[in-house]
From Swiss-Prot:
UniProt DNA-binding residue ranges: 69-252
Biological function: Probable transcriptional regulator involved in developmental processes.
Lineage top rank: taxon: Eukaryota
Matches recorded under InterPro entries: p53-like_TF_DNA-bd_sf, T-box_DNA-bd, T-box_sf, TF_T-box, TF_T-box_CS
Broad class of where this protein is predominantly found: nucleus
Protein's cellular compartments: Nucleus
One annotated Gene Ontology cellular component of this protein: nucleus
Region described as Disordered: 22-61
The protein, known as: T-box transcription factor TBX10
Organism of origin: Homo sapiens
Record PANTHER family: T-BOX PROTEIN-RELATED, T-BOX TRANSCRIPTION FACTOR TBX10
């Protein structure tokens, strides 16, 4: 497959604050905003295009592309409260998921779609429960390794992208700096802005020369959020439960009326943050009745899960710091200045695993602006050469 990412796309490091498009003074506090200050979080319309200065003219195959954010009213509702997104060591999917409708592509041309996340500012935040507001807690933590998430169907014809809603529901957020599954790495209690990029796969052999004109970036200010390890604003929790179709079990019961966990569960190690489920109760009972059976199940379940969840060997490991980097190293035969392997990690899709409740197992959930990521996460069906 012809190389489709050109050199020279990496100029603005993701660790830098991105100049967001605004309709007024962008650094004035918005009335009713849960944040003390920061970029204006109001949307500029059904679509928002952000192209840093100095890009020059664009290829007609991307200049006419327009993007519409799906579930815009829901995003705006979350934004009014101050959207929060959970980050975990294993990686957590976003809700609402980032979904867009694309128009204006060349039906016969190939395009790659990708996303990255940039800090909104250089601050770290904390949530004040007494005032239900976010407060600045200090200077931002050291920047996390910058990564780009490719849509798993990339590259594909424009006709395919425009035929249906494009969803990045496989994208996961993590706070694990050593993540080797290709997830987006973020700092907890920091604010981020997702960016969406459309890249034209230029078939010309010298496509590196046209790198600056072969992509177009889009930004929707209503999708910005604060990364958290647990929801801080109870209204965000309620809205997530009310609007997430996978939270049916929470809606059908009163959270305040849940029974207190039995005493044996208090011995569960504190390092385990997984929600306790009925299968844990069953497993605990089995261990009390038959210790031999319990030891057998605990010896089988981890090995079974390890076999199913073993990440592919070609997954990339992010470097320790951000550095502006070009995509020239992704081309076949081009020198690799950072030593980035040209193999693709495939963090998705993981197999749909159901734990054997008789074994006491835990059920698993169903679950470029001028761009300079330091690690590229390719999806299935992609070849970097």
């Amino acid at each position: 497959m012809a190389a489709f990412l050109s050199a020279g796309l990496g100029i603005l490091a993701p660790s830098e604050t991105y100049p967001l498009p605004t309709t007024s003074s962008g650094w004035e506090p918005r009335l009713g905003s849960p944040f003390p200050s920061g970029p204006c979080t109001s949307s500029t319309g059904a679509q928002a295009v952000a192209e840093p200065t100095g890009q020059g003219p664009k290829n007609p195959r991307v200049s006419r592309v327009t993007v519409q954010l799906e579930m815009k009213p829901l995003w705006e509702e979350f934004n009014q409260l101050g959207t929060e997104m959970i980050v975990t060591k294993a990686g957590r999917r976003m809700f609402p998921p980032f979904q867009v409708k694309i128009l204006g592509m060349d039906s016969l041309a190939d395009y790659a779609l990708l996303m990255d996340f940039i800090p909104l500012d250089d601050k770290r935040y904390r949530y004040a429960f007494h005032s239900s507001a976010w407060l600045v807690a200090g200077k931002a933590d050291p920047a996390t390794p910058g990564r780009v998430h490719f849509h798993p169907d990339s590259p594909a014809k424009g006709a395919q992208w425009m035929r249906q809603i494009v969803s990045f529901d496989k994208l996961k957020l993590t706070n694990n700096l050593l993540d080797d599954n290709g997830h987006i790495i973020l700092n907890s209690m920091h604010r981020y802005q997702p960016r969406f990029h459309v890249v034209f796969v230029d078939p010309r052999k010298d496509s590196e020369r046209y790198a600056q004109e072969n992509f177009k970036s889009f930004i929707f200010t209503e999708t910005q959020f604060t990364a958290v390890t647990a929801y801080q604003n109870h209204r965000i929790t309620q809205l997530k439960i009310a609007s997430n179709p996978f939270a049916k079990g929470f809606r059908e019961s009163d959270l305040d009326s849940w029974p207190v966990a039995p005493r044996p569960l208090l011995s569960v190690p504190a390092r385990s943050h997984s929600s306790l489920s009925p299968c844990v109760l069953k497993g605990a009972t089995d261990r009390e009745k038959d210790p031999n059976k319990a030891s057998a199940s605990t010896s089988k379940t981890p090995a079974w899960l390890h076999h199913q969840l073993l990440p592919p060997p070609e997954v990339l490991l992010a470097p320790a710091t951000y550095r502006p980097v070009t995509y020239q190293s992704l081309y076949s035969g081009a020198p690799s200045h950072l030593g980035i392997p040209r193999t693709r990690p495939a963090p998705y899709p993981l197999p749909n695993i159901r734990a054997d409740r008789d074994q006491g197992g835990l059920p698993l959930p169903a679950g470029l602006g001028l761009l300079s990521p330091t690690v590229v996460c390719l999806g299935p069906g992609q070849d970097s050469q």
